[in-house]
């Protein structure tokens, strides 16, 4: 939730004049244990962009957010500054976790879904000039998010749910929830700590049916997201939502 709040859907600029950038630490391991406190490696990215790539969550698993860091030359330092004399910081661990929650698409309540993937569709382009070795500018050129949902209910593809021709998905009627965990159970539905994603777009059949001998068949639907006629965003995210 914190990453989604900070990155948004199209990324966050890294600027060394207003923040220290991003540092990735690599702990050195000797044959008989870890190295001394100041002999580890670090990679520092002082300027660039950090961009969300995809969010995935499967039945009984925790949601995962993947992102890319695209560094550029900041005018003084290389795009990536390497040090082999780094001291490791104290790592802060956030125990918050989310998993699959209720899903409504095309004003239909889905059942028997097993996997959700949101590809944020961010295409990043870097460039430079004057024979610079490192890239000197970066931009998100396109943002074309898609949602893929896999389930084991063949009735998704029926006249009473989703026809093979697909249907419209709208923020006014549809939502995807990520349910927050609490120990071995879940946070109460009425507590505003869940994640709600509301999409606009067109739902289509990704794979009407896939099955093997003695295996449960699967069905896949895809939602191509886009801005609606009122100018609402392709996908809205609320990280402090109750489930309704």
PLM features per residue range, with description:
Residues 1-244:
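Signature of extracytoplasmic/envelope-associated structural regions
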């Amino acid at each position: 939730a914190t990453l989604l709040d900070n990155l948004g859907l199209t990324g966050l600029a890294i600027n060394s004049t207003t923040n220290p950038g991003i540092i990735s630490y690599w702990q050195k391991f000797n044959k008989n244990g870890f190295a001394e406190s100041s002999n580890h490696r670090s990679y520092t990215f002082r300027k660039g962009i950090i961009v969300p790539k995809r969010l995935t969550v499967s039945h009984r698993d925790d949601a995962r957010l993947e992102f890319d860091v695209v560094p550029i030359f900041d005018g003084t330092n290389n795009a990536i500054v390497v040090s082999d004399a780094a001291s490791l910081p104290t790592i802060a661990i956030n125990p918050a976790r989310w998993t699959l929650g209720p899903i409504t698409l095309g004003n239909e309540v889905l059942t028997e879904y097993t996997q959700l993937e949101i590809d944020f569709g961010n295409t990043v382009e870097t460039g430079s000039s004057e024979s610079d070795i490192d890239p000197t500018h970066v931009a998100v050129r396109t943002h074309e998010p898609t949602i893929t949902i896999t389930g084991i209910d063949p009735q998704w593809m029926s006249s009473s749910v989703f026809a093979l021709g697909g249907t419209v998905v709208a923020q006014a009627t549809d939502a995807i929830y990520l349910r927050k965990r609490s120990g071995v159970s879940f946070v109460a539905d009425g507590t505003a700590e869940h994640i709600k994603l509301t999409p606009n777009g067109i739902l289509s059949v990704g794979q009407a049916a896939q099955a093997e001998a003695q295996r449960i068949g699967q069905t896949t639907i895809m939602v191509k997201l886009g801005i609606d006629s009122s100018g609402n965003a392709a996908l809205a995210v609320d990280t402090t939502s109750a489930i309704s």
